[in-house]
Amino acid sequence: MARNWKFDPQEQIDYTIEWIKKYFVKKAGPDTKAIIGISGGKDSTIAAALLVRALGAERVHGVLMPCGNQADIAHSYEICNALGIQFDEINIEPVVDVFYGCVGHGDCEIPAVRTNVPARMRMVTLYAIAAIYGGRVVNTGNWSEGWIGYTTKYGDLAGDFHLFQDLTVREVLMMGRIMEEIPRHLVDKAPADGMTGQTDEDNMGVTYEQIDAFLLEDILPDVNTWRNMSQRHERNEHKKCINLPGPFAHGRHYEKGKHGGVFEVF
């Protein structure tokens, strides 16, 4: 990785906006909408703001997908209103419950099922909305999540294009903090899965800053944390079968094993 390279959030914002514009010219059409799941978290919030800057609010359509009662859904309303985008709210809990009943196994109670089925149902919902409105689904995950595998295959890993696959949590935050249209508390809120009541970092047993320090600076945490990180990374290698086009971070050079994405240059 280039040791003298410094991430410039404004440069990345400008580049990402241009990438979005070119993607929709070449891969879609003048009326095609961007369809984005709005969770109220930093990634979907910042991605939505970038899409609005690139395409205009009229071509960005949000989808709110609580599973039952979502305690922080007010944050999803807040960002949609702040950006002036239209949105649908679809509670996926009834469909998820029917699915569990159809499967008919007590094993539906295990955490892997309870975590991954709603994530996949959300992606099914996004593609249904995309078909209705004529749109492309944006993936809002980041490199830090992807590297450690804190994602769901065919759930939040899916989409038509991927805005942050080359950016760590640290870098996405740097971008969001200089975008004045975004309420700051939505940028800085702790990432959470919305189901267990815990943050992502609680669930993983590692902080995003520790992941980013390794990815960007080759700084290793303590032995136990590194063992946890590396084991999670290795166990989740199978998720890398899904590669989407997306912008890259300028000037970055990669070491084998750290990254695997598809960066499309127009």
Predicted region positions:
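ATP/NTP-dependent adenylation/nucleotidyl-transfer catalytic domains that generate, transfer
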Residues: 1-36, 58-61, 68-69, 79-94, ...
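Conserved G/P- and acidic residue-centered "switch" motifs that form tight phosphate/ATP-binding loops
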Residues: 41
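Short, surface-exposed alpha-helical segments at coil->helix boundaries
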Residues: 44-48, 73-77
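Short, well-ordered alpha-helices that flank and scaffold nucleotide-derived cofactor binding pockets
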Residues: 49-53
